[in-house]
């Protein structure tokens, strides 16, 4: 017998008459009797009903958005849209009409043929009026390539060089793997746009991006005059491009941008492809978009950044090789953008691609000074970025260093990659690096010099091939470079973010150089016969302690004046290393664990509140104000002269601290801006007597910088608050590790390995996806059989 159909809900009339209802609208009984048929809404619904309702609402939302975008972006079609709306045409029909006239899914191959063709050819420069017609048809193809490398195509993740995603802790990572944009060609025709093609990106569509008003000054070198073109198909809004360029060149890590601002901006305005290209401009704009803090609209910020970066990668993929200067610079800028997103593996691949392009690029010896400077900054900056990443991640194998790396990937040994040829090429590249340093500006040169000195020694020490004499030489090079740095720059209260970052990196280099020798120098090749005698009889443990303190102090100064909401790309790694070293000096790890668990990032966000105030105020105990620091005994005998401004002020201060930690009248003018102070000098201190320091320090000077304590527990608290206030993936993971200090503290040291750490952590180590572990804990990957060379 067939199963009888059940009606889940009868109409009101059939329910009242207690007759059978077929559930139709109107039902058969009401229709035959001519009665009004009505249903009472059910009090419960199945999941199928809810899914249908959700899908219906989503369709209505998409239709409404399509109509709104059309009204906003296409002034010439307003009358057509309004006439259809006034004609009571349904939103669904209007949305279908918009999609038909926009041809949303036109073939990407036809669209990509409009972009820059040959190598070195000048790009197609569109005026705002010319770009309007072509922009909406080109945007979706640019956005489609925002997924190359680390974004999504449909449901699959496409890594840069591997068929499967990689982990930062995998032991088979090889920097010799070439990054080939050519391999991404299969995705060029994937018709899966991330954004509607009709959407135009402009400053008006980003209302919450903190773009400064046009009346406010830009970075020197970027004038308020309208730009003649934008060099990008993503937007024709010249004002937006102007603001993003200003944002990029004013970034706190601009010394690592590898791009001379004056040469680039001149080429940008004149359409000169020698210093500028579409790929480089898109990379710069994407990096600038992603550097905005959380105060900006996260959706708009990411949409802009992904679109610009995706277009840069697409343009680089169309190049047969990257032998021109702008392409090499674009790869390096993309690497910095990936670092800021916490994507260390992608940044690693892009940085190596930049170095490989710099090596294979033909060098011209008869060039003007402007091009020599641009080439030197790009060449040395690319190598320095790799050196930094290797120091921060423990990938110090000598065979895979930039100077001795393989140029080609494959099972067969090519003549260029034979060991002897790699050694000869390594010496030649190192000599070229030293020659290019002569053309670099003073600030980048300082960073390049100390990084190369520390990286060279660390690479040989990694394979147990370094000697005590080489350690002394590397340490001496760092001190000499800092002395020249101090003589060149006035390290006063008006210091720039770049100067602060350079000093933080200098102290991290000292920490990375001497941390393996705090307990023992047994890893040195001649340690049994020779004990390293550092300049001024310096002690590695004292230097590491003072350097870690200096990193935290300088970061606090940076936070006070520039905010840590969006920090320089590598700052979280260095700060975490300093905090972890202070953990090893802390006698009570349980107390630290309690502090780390009570971290409240919002306490350190104020530009006026000092980190030390926030750290101790978080516990509601006003009696925990740190005491005055102890004078540096025999300071000049083991610490490089001169000191950084913060440490220098700490040495000079001995007067009791007043209740007010900052004197607003002496620090800020009526407009809220910092006033320069001539009472704070950068001269080297010659007196260490407390009475002399007290008499030479004024109240204004005493209140000008935060007063810090050198107690390890207090420094860990301050550093933890600083990390918690950073909007950075590595800082988030570092904060999570600091909450486990009670279990990690006894393991921190030069002999720590990943297996021991994995057993000690209270959470799976696989949850940590960046290189912050290697940075803070001083970890190094297991060395392979060393190449038999004697380094430059």
UniProtKB/Swiss-Prot annotation:
A molecular function (GO) term: zinc ion binding
Keyword Hydrolase (UniProt): no
Main location: nucleus
Record feature DNA-binding region, as residue ranges: 11-37
Region annotated Disordered, chain positions: 662-704
Source taxon at top rank: Eukaryota
Cross-referenced CDD domains: fungal_TF_MHR (cd12148), GAL4 (cd00067)
Subcellular location: Nucleus
GO CC, one annotated term: nucleus
Record has Transcription as a keyword: yes
Disulfide bonds: none
A Gene Ontology BP annotation from the UniProt entry: sporulation resulting in formation of a cellular spore
Sequence ranges of Polar residues compositional bias: 678-688
Keyword terms: Conidiation, DNA-binding, Metal-binding, Nucleus, Sporulation, Transcription, Transcription regulation, Zinc
Protein function: Required for conidiophore morphogenesis where it has a role in the budding phase.
Protein name: Conidial development protein fluffy
Native organism taxonomy: Eukaryota, Fungi, Dikarya, Ascomycota, Pezizomycotina
